[in-house]
Amino acid sequence: MSLNDFLSSVLPVSEQFEYLSLQSIPLETHAVVTPNKDDKRVPKSTIKTQHFFSLFHQGKVFFSLEVYVYVTLWDEADAERLIFVSKADTNGYCNTRVSVRDITKIILEFILSIDPNYYLQKVKPAIRSYKKISPELISAASTPARTLRILARRLKQSGSTVLKEIESPRFQQDLYLSFTCPREILTKICLFTRPASQYLFPDSSKNSKKHILNGEELMKWWGFILDRLLIECFQNDTQAKLRIPGEDPARVRSYLRGMKYPLWQVGDIFTSKENSLAVYNIPLFPDDPKARFIHQLAEEDRLLKVSLSSFWIELQERQEFKLSVTSSVMGISGYSLATPSLFPSSADVIVPKSRKQFRAIKKYITGEEYDTEEGAIEAFTNIRDFLLLRMATNLQSLTGKREHRERNQPVPASNINTLAITMLKPRKKAKALPKT
C-alpha cells in the first residue's frame, strides 16, 4: 500500500486533500542509548531518519506530525528499529470533520510497513573521509585551486560545471554508506506526552476552533493509538509500558484498565533494573525532556551517580513537570505481525537534498503564525510554490474513502462484537401494573 492508500482509508469519502511527506537523508548518528563500556553488546551503527507529515484541505494546512526512525545495527544478523513520535499538532482550520487520532495512527502504520533496509541504502556517514573520495568531486577538503581546476575540466568536457553523474553508483559509494539487516527485527515505538497549547503551529491556540487536550486526555488519546497498534500490528507477546513520573503505580495501573491489549504494565521499555545508572538506559531523543535532563546531569558531573529510580524522582521536580499536569512516557517493544516490505516511492516521500533544505521546507509550516486562518493559507501556498519552483514536484492529492456513519445509525449485524453485548447494563425491572 502507498501512503495515499493509507491516508484515504481514514479521510471522509469524496473529500479532496493534499499531503506533504518529507523525509531526511538517513544519517549515521550516536547510539540512541549511551552504551556502557562493560556491555558485551555494543551497536555497530545507528541510522537516524526524520519524517515530517502535513495534511491540507481546501488550501489550508491543518495537521502535522513529526517522527524519527532509528535503525540500530548490532551486527549483520541483528538489528532493531525504534520509532520516536516527537510531535503531533492541529490548528483547527479544517472545514470538514476528520479523525486526527485515526490519521495519526494510520501514518504510524505506514511507517511500520516500511522495510528497515529502505533507510540503509544511502546513509550519510557521521564523518566523511575526504581522502578516499574521487578526485572528480569537490569536497570540504578541496583547495580553491583544485576546485577551480575541477570546474574548468567539467566545463570543457560537458559544457557545464554541474556534475551530471553525481547520482551514479561510482560516486554514491564515495559519499554514502550502505548496510543491510533482516526485515523482521525488534520494533519499538516510544513517545512522551505533555500537554501544550501548540506544538507545531505557533499561535494556533488563539483559534477558538482548535481542540486542546489536558494532560490526562492527551495521555489517553495516545494510549488509544498505541493500544490499537498493539492489537492490529504487533505479535501478542509485545511489551507495552506506561510511566507517569511522580505518580503512584496503583494510580498508573488504573489508567491501564481501559486498554484492550492485556500486557500493559507500569514502567518504560528502556529500564532494565531500577538501581542501574540512568545514563546507560535513557534514550537521547531530539527536543525531549529526558534527554535534556541527562545533559544537565553531564554538566553537573553526576552522570555516574544517578540511578534510574533517582532519575525519575528528580525528573518530576523539573520545571516542565511542575505544572500540575499529567505527563507520561509510553512505549511498546515487539515484533510486527506482518513483515515490513514497503520501499516508499517518490509519491510517498519527498527527500530534500540536504538537512538545510529539509528544515527550510518544514519551516514553511512551523514558522507561520496561526492566530488567524491566513497562516494556514500562507503555509499551503508557500509549500506548494517551493516544491513546484525549486524541486519540480507537487503536493500529493488524494480523495477520502471513509464513509461517515451517524452515531444513531445501527451497526451491521456482521460487525457486532458479541463480547460488547454481554457487557451491556442489566435491564431495569419493569414497573408492576397498578392493581385494578
From Swiss-Prot:
Catalytic activity annotation: L-lysyl-[histone] + acetyl-CoA = N(6)-acetyl-L-lysyl-[histone] + CoA + H(+); L-lysyl-[protein] + acetyl-CoA = N(6)-acetyl-L-lysyl-[protein] + CoA + H(+)
User: Which Gene Ontology cellular-component terms appear in the entry?
Assistant: chromatin; H3 histone acetyltransferase complex; nucleus
| Effect of mutating L148D | Decreases binding and activity stimulation by VPS75. Decreases acetylation of histone H3 'Lys-9' and 'Lys-27'
Entry EC no(s): 2.3.1.48
Q: Which GO terms describe its molecular function?
A: histone H3 acetyltransferase activity; histone H3K14 acetyltransferase activity; histone H3K23 acetyltransferase activity; histone H3K27 acetyltransferase activity; histone H3K56 acetyltransferase activity; histone H3K9 acetyltransferase activity; protein-lysine-acetyltransferase activity
Quote the record's binding site residues for acetyl-CoA.
A88, D89, T90, R97, V98, S99, V100, R101, F192, A196, H211, I212, L213, W221
Where is region (Interaction with VPS75) located?
Answer: 128-170
* Keywords recorded for this protein, A-Z: Acetylation, DNA damage, Nucleus, Transcription, Transcription regulation, Transferase
Q: Where is the active site?
A: D288 (proton donor/acceptor)
According to its UniProt record, this protein's enzyme class is transferase
The Gene Ontology biological process annotation of the record reads: cellular response to stress; DNA damage response; maintenance of rDNA; nucleosome assembly; protein modification process; regulation of double-strand break repair via nonhomologous end joining; regulation of gene expression; regulation of transcription by RNA polymerase II
Which cysteines share a disulfide bond? none
Name of the protein in question: Histone acetyltransferase RTT109
Question: From which source organism is this entry?
Answer: Saccharomyces cerevisiae (strain ATCC 204508 / S288c)
Gene that codes for this? RTT109
